[in-house]
């Protein structure tokens, strides 16, 4: 009888421990700070990502040099835009494909060369799977998230006027110069604007 009682007690304790571990598993992400390693030469990006996902949308400060190999440095004063692919912590520049930069109001022309914006650091936040920031100069709040294969951008325009989204196909996180896109075309469906 004694061994049966001990076995039942051990089984009950194992079930309680398993249930407790399973219940607490989802709460562990509250301990994650995606900004750790984003300054200096940590080569980490606060991009939104899921484990083993194909995309990681996040901010890019620059596309040049070893110190910016993730595309992001916390102390950099401006954001160039938001690209859809990043490698975090690798120490070598790669990806940074298809940079997007939203703005409200008439800001850019065909002759414009600087599309960057200063982020409001008080509004910049990241948690596993989500990145957010406000760009006051561009009149937009940016929210990025990811699924296994899709980068999702949401832009909330805080200023009236003309809304623009720059799509930069030449941007990429690489060492050196040279063409990244050698041939491209674009068209606008006149019926849809």
Question: What residue ranges belong to the model's regions?
Answer:
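Bacterial N-terminal signal peptides
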Residues: 7-17
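Positively charged n-region of N-terminal signal peptides that target proteins for export
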Residues: 1-6
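Accessory carbohydrate-recognition regions in carbohydrate-active enzymes
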Residues: 22-193
């Amino acid at each position: 009888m004694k061994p049966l009682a001990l076995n039942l007690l051990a089984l009950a304790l194992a079930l309680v421990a398993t249930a407790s571990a399973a219940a607490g598993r989802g709460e562990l992400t509250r301990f994650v700070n995606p900004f750790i390693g984003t300054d200096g030469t940590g080569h980490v990006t606060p991009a939104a990502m899921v484990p083993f996902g194909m995309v990681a949308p996040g901010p890019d400060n620059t596309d040049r040099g070893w110190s910016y190999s993730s595309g992001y440095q916390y102390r950099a004063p401006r954001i160039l835009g938001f690209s859809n692919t990043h490698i975090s912590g690798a120490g070598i520049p790669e990806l940074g494909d298809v940079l997007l930069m939203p703005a409200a109001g008439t800001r850019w022309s065909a002759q414009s060369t600087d599309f960057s914006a200063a982020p409001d650091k008080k509004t910049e936040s990241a948690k596993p799977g989500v990145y957010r920031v406000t760009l006051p100069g561009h009149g937009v709040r940016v929210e990025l998230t990811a699924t296994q294969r899709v980068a999702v951008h949401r832009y909330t325009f805080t200023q009236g006027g003309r809304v623009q989204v720059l799509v930069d196909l030449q941007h990429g996180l690489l060492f050196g110069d040279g063409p990244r896109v050698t041939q491209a075309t674009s068209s606008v469906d006149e019926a849809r604007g």
